[in-house]
A protein has these predicted regions:
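Core beta-strand elements of the Rossmann-like FAD/NAD(P) dinucleotide-binding domain
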Residues: 2, 146-152
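N-terminal Rossmann-like FAD-binding beta1-loop-alpha1 element of flavoenzymes
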Residues: 2-29
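Conserved Rossmann-like nucleotide-cofactor binding loop
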Residues: 12, 35, 46
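Glycine-rich active-site loop/strand segments that organize a redox cofactor
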Residues: 45-96
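Short beta-strand to alpha-helix junction loop
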Residues: 68-78, 95-115, 126
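Short, conserved active-site loop motifs that form the nucleotide-linked donor/cofactor pocket
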Residues: 122-124
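A conserved short coil-to-beta-strand element within the FAD-binding core of flavoproteins
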Residues: 127-140
């Protein structure tokens, strides 16, 4: 049984898994595709826009600008960049504040995320077997995969 189950091995799923692993949790990361981060390779026209140093509530035009203020205060761009730097990713900031990997390719972002995950023995990675059901009982989540396997 894992402390944390993460559904989806995209950028957010890998970041969530790494955050839990960094905090000492055992993690099961489940990705329906055969490989992690496939969609990441197309972000930012293949360059992978990591964050924007000029992001702020004044640039947010949704119905709840207070959410943007709260979210940015919880995890500012500088923290995102520092986190990627701990994994060895070098970045470049454009004049408009958009931040990309120095290589200008999303592959380098995916490579550092995958390498960071691979360092943890407390990670169980399941790919190519989509989740068909999630149940919660007595404080335990059980994910049933299309293959019939159950993960807790």
């Amino acid at each position: 049984m894992s402390d944390v189950i993460v559904l989806g091995g995209g950028a957010s799923g890998m970041a969530a898994a790494l955050t839990a692993l960094e905090r000492g949790c055992t993690v099961t990361l489940i990705e329906r595709q055969a490989r992690l981060g496939r969609k990441l390779l197309t972000t930012g026209n293949g360059r992978c826009n990591l964050t924007n140093e000029h992001a702020g509530p004044d640039h947010y035009h949704g119905e709840r600008p207070e959410f943007c203020r709260y979210a940015l205060a919880q995890y500012p761009a500088a923290e995102t960049l520092a986190w990627f730097a701990t994994m060895g990713l070098e970045t470049v900031t454009e004049a408009d504040g958009r931040v990309y990997p120095r290589t200008n390719t999303a592959n380098s972002v995916l490579d550092v995320l995958r390498a960071a995950l691979a360092r943890y023995e407390s990670l169980t990675l399941l790919t190519g077997d989509p989740v068909s059901a999630v149940k919660h009982k007595n404080g335990v989540f059980t994910c049933t995969l299309e293959s019939g396997a159950a993960v807790q």
